[in-house]
């Protein structure tokens, strides 16, 4: 910052930092959230200097809150889902992405599940979400098919973890392990931003598009507030076009 401004540390002003912020955003293409983080660390540094009486005031405090762009987090498209399915090299991986999509569970919830938690006949299961709040969720026929195939291949018993590592001694899969597996799957399928939470967003969007009331989607996802559900769900462009054709 000092090199860019060509100033000593005790002469930097809030206006200087706003100029620095504008330059980094427009010329360097740095995201606003990244600049917010940088200014947070700079503010802590200047607070230290004020405490040590090396400078009189903290110029970062005069910058104010940066306006952050609201990033629209998109669900997987139908084509992307098919590419992901076609790129699975193992039954476990196919079972996992079908499970994530079908149930809409958080990845932390999935890693806590055991085989006995699945009521395969009813295609149901109970998960324990935030605050140990339980909710019931469901398996599609496709998810049931691949999950049964995967568990049979493993000869899995009731007390075993639902998803395990491929290497012996086949330990329970962790959140980082699942995230890594999905990143690799995304690379093979050429689908960017392939991570567990995106499957949750996708099923929520698809359920709404098919007519499920948003209050029911809220319960399905285990949200406390309806506002949270609204953030998770996006409307696909083709839906807008179809509605326009119908109502315009």
What are the roles of these predicted feature ranges?
Residues 1-248:
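Conserved catalytic core of the tyrosine transesterase superfamily
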């Amino acid at each position: 910052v000092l090199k860019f401004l060509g100033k000593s540390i005790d002469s930097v002003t809030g206006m200087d930092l706003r100029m620095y912020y504008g330059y980094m955003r427009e010329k360097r293409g740095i995201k606003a959230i990244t600049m917010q983080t940088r200014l947070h660390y700079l503010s802590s540094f200047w607070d230290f200097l004020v405490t040590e009486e090396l400078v009189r005031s903290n110029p970062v405090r005069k910058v104010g809150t940066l306006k952050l762009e609201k990033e629209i987090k998109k669900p997987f498209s139908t084509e992307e889902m098919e590419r992901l399915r076609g790129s699975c090299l193992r039954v476990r991986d196919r079972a996992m992405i079908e499970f994530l999509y079908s149930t809409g569970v958080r990845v932390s919830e999935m890693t806590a599940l055991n085989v006995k938690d699945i009521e395969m006949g009813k295609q149901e299961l109970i998960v324990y979400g935030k605050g140990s709040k339980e909710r019931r969720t469901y398996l599609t026929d496709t998810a049931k098919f691949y999950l049964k195939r995967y568990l049979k291949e493993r000869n899995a018993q009731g007390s075993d973890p639902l998803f395990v590592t491929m290497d012996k001694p086949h330990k329970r899969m962790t959140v980082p392990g699942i995230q890594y597996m999905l990143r690799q799957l995304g690379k093979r399928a050429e689908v960017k931003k392939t991570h567990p939470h995106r499957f949750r967003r996708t099923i929520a969007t698809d359920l709404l598009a098919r007519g499920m009331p948003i209050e029911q989607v809220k319960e399905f996802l285990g949200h406390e507030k309806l506002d949270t559900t609204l953030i998770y769900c996006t409307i696909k462009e083709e839906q807008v076009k179809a509605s326009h054709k119908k109502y315009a």
